[in-house]
Amino acid sequence: MHISEKGLVLIKRYEGLRLKAYQCRAGRWTLGYGHTHNLNIGDVITQEQAEAFLREDIAQVTALLNTQIKVPLTQNQYDAICSLVFNIGMTAFTTSTLLKKLNVGDYSGASAEFMKWSKAKVNGKRTPLPGLIKRRQAEKALFESA
């Protein structure tokens, strides 16, 4: 499967576009639409470069999902999971209870797991972040609208 335009819009809405590298609330250097690889303080890009980074980052996410998910998904379910994985990272997803529940066909149980990913480390402590709570609510609603 591939992410749809609706899925890309969801990711862009919650990641936001930043053309200059900044440190996110969790302390990671970020640029464009949530791109975090090979960045240096002070890096600046164009919107076109941000779009290219997003396509590259999404390609990695979809490649992972297409090998790890063993059950059929609707496009909305796939898009919701793409957004989640884009945000939490591939390693976190592959070891998640959400994936385990999904792969045994427990779609309801998988949906319930989204909200467990609404915290980030801030000053060394796992803290609920309002932006993550809203994002997880949107992803969960999209997943359930299958």
From Swiss-Prot:
Keywords: Antimicrobial, Bacteriolytic enzyme, Cytolysis, Glycosidase, Host cell lysis by virus, Host cytoplasm, Hydrolase, Viral release from host cell. The gene is 13. HAMAP family: ENDOLYSIN_T4 (MF_04110). This is Endolysin. GO terms for biological process: cell wall macromolecule catabolic process; defense response to bacterium; peptidoglycan catabolic process; viral release from host cell by cytolysis. PANTHER family: LYSOZYME RRRD-RELATED (PTHR38107:SF3), PTHR38107. Gene3D superfamilies: 1.10.530.40. GO terms for cellular component: host cell cytoplasm. Belongs to the glycosyl hydrolase 24 family. InterPro entries: Bacteriophage_GH24, Endolysin_autolysin, Endolysin_T4_type, Glyco_hydro_24, Lysozyme-like_dom_sf, Lysozyme_dom_sf. The active site is at E15, C24.
